[in-house]
């Protein structure tokens, strides 16, 4: 079983974009930025435990960081791993969670 500490380190932040919003509305899919070494099983367990929902599937991808320059200096942004988490029918994820 996955430890409580590991569950808290797997999910970094929700990924907010136009594509993520469309996926949430049409396919009941939520997009998260996750730890690079996180597995699909860990992501599923973390979402189910933290948000108390049932997960249907998890798809992951790694976006490569862009090369950026400022004058003569050149650097590179970090790679980011994203997880598309599809929830089962009738399940809804509320980020606010009862805040008033």
Swiss-Prot record:
In the record, what terms sit under GO molecular function?
rRNA binding; structural constituent of ribosome
Give the domain of life: Bacteria
Q: Which InterPro entries match?
A: Nucleotide-bd_a/b_plait_sf, Ribosomal_uL23-like, Ribosomal_uL23/eL15/eS24_sf, Ribosomal_uL23_CS
Keyword RNA-binding found: yes
The cysteines joined by S-S bonds are: none
Biological process, per Gene Ontology = translation
The Gene Ontology CC terms held by the record are: ribonucleoprotein complex; ribosome
Key word Transferase present: no
* UniProt entry keywords in alphabetical sequence: Ribonucleoprotein, Ribosomal protein, RNA-binding, rRNA-binding
Q: Which Pfam families match?
A: Ribosomal_L23 (PF00276)
Record-stated family: Belongs to the universal ribosomal protein uL23 family.
- Subunit architecture: Part of the 50S ribosomal subunit. Contacts protein L29, and trigger factor when it is bound to the ribosome.
Q: Which NCBIfam families match?
A: PRK05738.1-1 (NF004358), PRK05738.1-3 (NF004359), PRK05738.1-5 (NF004360), PRK05738.2-4 (NF004363)
Query: What's this chain's function?
Result: One of the early assembly proteins it binds 23S rRNA. One of the proteins that surrounds the polypeptide exit tunnel on the outside of the ribosome. Forms the main docking site for trigger factor binding to the ribosome.
Any idea what this protein is called? Answer: Large ribosomal subunit protein uL23
Provenance organism: Vibrio campbellii (strain ATCC BAA-1116)
Species lineage = Bacteria, Pseudomonadati, Pseudomonadota, Gammaproteobacteria, Vibrionales
């Amino acid at each position: 079983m996955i430890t409580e500490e590991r569950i808290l380190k797997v999910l970094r932040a929700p990924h907010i974009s136009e594509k993520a919003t469309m996926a949430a509305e049409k396919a009941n899919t939520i997009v998260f930025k996750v730890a690079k070494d996180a597995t699909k099983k860990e992501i599923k367990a973390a979402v189910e435990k933290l948000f108390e929902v049932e997960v249907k599937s998890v798809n992951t991808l790694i976006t490569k960081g862009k090369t950026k320059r400022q004058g003569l200096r050149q650097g590179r942004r970090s790679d980011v791993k994203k997880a598309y988490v599809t929830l089962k029918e009738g399940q809804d994820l509320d980020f606010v969670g009862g805040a008033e």
